[in-house]
From Swiss-Prot:
Entry keyword set: Allosteric enzyme, ATP-binding, Cytoplasm, Kinase, Nucleotide-binding, Pyrimidine biosynthesis, Transferase
Residues bound to UMP: 66, 127-134
Similarity remark: Belongs to the UMP kinase family.
Quaternary assembly: Homohexamer.
Pathway(s) it belongs to: Pyrimidine metabolism; CTP biosynthesis via de novo pathway; UDP from UMP (UMPK route): step 1/1
GO-annotated biological processes: 'de novo' CTP biosynthetic process; UDP biosynthetic process
Protein's UniProt name: Uridylate kinase
Gene: pyrH
Species assigned in the record: Thermotoga maritima (strain ATCC 43589 / DSM 3109 / JCM 10099 / NBRC 100826 / MSB8)
Region feature Involved in allosteric activation by GTP, mapped onto this chain: 14-19
Amino acid sequence: MRVLVKLSGEALSGEGGRGFDPERVNYIVNEIKSAIEEGFKIGIVVGAGNLFRGVELKNLTMTRADQIGLLGTVMNSVYLKDIFERSGLKARIYSQIVNLPDVERVNYDSIESALRENSILIFAGGTSNPFFTTDTAAVLRAQEMRAKLVVKATKVDGVYDKDPKKFPDAKKIPHLTFSEAMKMGLKVMDAEAFALCKKLGITVKVINFFEPGTLLKALKGEDVGSTVVPD
């Protein structure tokens, strides 16, 4: 089974942190390694919130601020590749925005070859264009690696009808469609990512990635998190 895991940059630094937290990064490696050992084919899209905050770039023109964010995802991807390989895993980085020794251009034959080798695919540089989020990039790259599942790795155990941090009476919604999520105004993903999921028939699973073992449970179809399906 092929799956694309969407990680926030904050996953690498810890909440409110900057840069890289070795303990958090080792946790990520172990969770991904467990999935690889069970035979799952893994792709990753990572954000850059551990390196750049939106508020820090607010005085720049939007296109240039987005370019800085895209480059941040490349930095995170190179970091992850090194850590994965030091842990005995194979990993390859694909991007359309840079030419670095460790970064390959997106090539479908190369992607298939890497998956046969059980390499982790790390997709850097978002969609390569400004104005698109890493959520949209995750769906696009899932399609390119022929995965029909995107796991959004968050610190919340699923989708709620309102923010559970602000509202103690928030109710978890274990299963819903993209149309329902959009109608309810739920911020699971941005509208462009939702639309692409609907068009491509890709399912999104929202989990609390930082509950040990939850990723593997989600991949095995166990009842964790929330599942958002095409209509």
